[in-house]
Amino acid sequence: MAGVQSCQMIREASCHCGKLALRCSGEPAKISLCHCFDCQRRTGSLFSVAAFYPRAAVEIIQGNAKGFRRHSASGFDVTFHFCPECGSNLWWEADRLPDLAGVAVGSFADRNFPVPEQVVWAEEKHHWLQLPAELPSHAQNPPQAIPRK
């Protein structure tokens, strides 16, 4: 239709020092909270929260990232991209999900960011941590790939 503009959500994420920034277009395909020990070590926290976007929707708008590749508990390799200055891990690309990039939700610094839709690797969750009971939970990764919205 002539004269009609599409309103697509644009969100920006940045590292702790601000020298590396991303722009994410559209809504995430899925938002997951992960308790795996790898994410606990990577974040220094009890879990990580990732917004999974199509890789083509994630664009570096400032700085250059450094990468670190390793084998994950899911049996696939993952490449983590982080700021070479402050070390913040902004996003990762898992071979298990070849079309998606997981962006660290905390890097958006947006308290109105959508709520996670699922919990993964719940078998490694700290026993005293309480999460909303209505959040679907998987002992490890869900058996199917992340569905597209």
Give each language-model segment a name.
Residues 2-149:
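A short Gly-Trp-Pro
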